[in-house]
Amino acid sequence: MELQHIKDNVYYLRGVINIGVVVGEEGQALLIDSGLGDRSGRRILRALEAEGLKPAAVLNTHCHGDHSGGNTYLVEQAGAKVYSPLHDAVILRQPVWGTLCLFAGADPIHELAIPRFSLRPSPVDVIVTEGELTVDGVTVEAVALPGHTGTHTGYITSGVFFLGDALCSEQELENAGIPYGYSVTMRLDTLQKLQNYNCDYYLLAHESLRRDIGELVELNRKRVEETLAFIVDYLSRQPAEASDVMVAVCEHFGLQLHNRGQIAFKIEGNRLLWYVDHCGGTGERSFNQCKTTAYMS
């Protein structure tokens, strides 16, 4: 990781997850997110130390492990303070709630116990709310951008807007088809809100630096509205259960839920049989080798 200058005292560490860096007058560094796991925390710390900087705080955009997994390492090794939005702080402090939510309240299967979903518990020193925030002598503006999570938050300083996962890049939209979201309503409201900002630079978590996001905001909005329109049209032609709607949406957008080979399904009579292999395998096992079978009528 190498420090990339954006403008004034604002930088970022480019990677699979871009880490924002705001530098104070005394060499203190405010980080926007911390990457995935201890390895990311270690790489961030080394990159900062190479520039004579010390991480004073991590400002998390949200709780997902690829954005907050380095928190605990930076707290333990550098004494960094952690700032987080309210709902996300619950999962940072007790990550099990995140995996429980993903698995409908049940004990999560083995595949969910990976750093992206099952990070180390992180302390949270300050709950972030929308408005001006001064951290160790450095002032930033916290902007509520819910949708990806319930309290997802972006940060602005010196005309640079750190967006976290509030926007998906063109490549992400192509890969995911339908991006993950906590609330479609919140996502649409956030996309509308983003049109009101005129910053010098915008940094997406998984994309390169941009000078303008107008077209990307519209592309994100269009994808959400296309999905909603398809669902409304589908349900206007016949009543359907949620599982039928899910299948129809996946077929319409060419999505596959079993592309990693960890979860597969087939229809037998009136039952949907889910075969979940949580032995840590490669995904190449046949159905009869799976350890767990759940039946859904």
Cite the ranges covered by each PLM segment.
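Conserved beta-strand segments of alpha/beta enzyme cores
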Residues: 2, 11, 81, 126, ...
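Conserved HGGG/HGGXW glycine-rich cap/lid loop of the alpha/beta-hydrolase fold
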Residues: 11, 67, 144
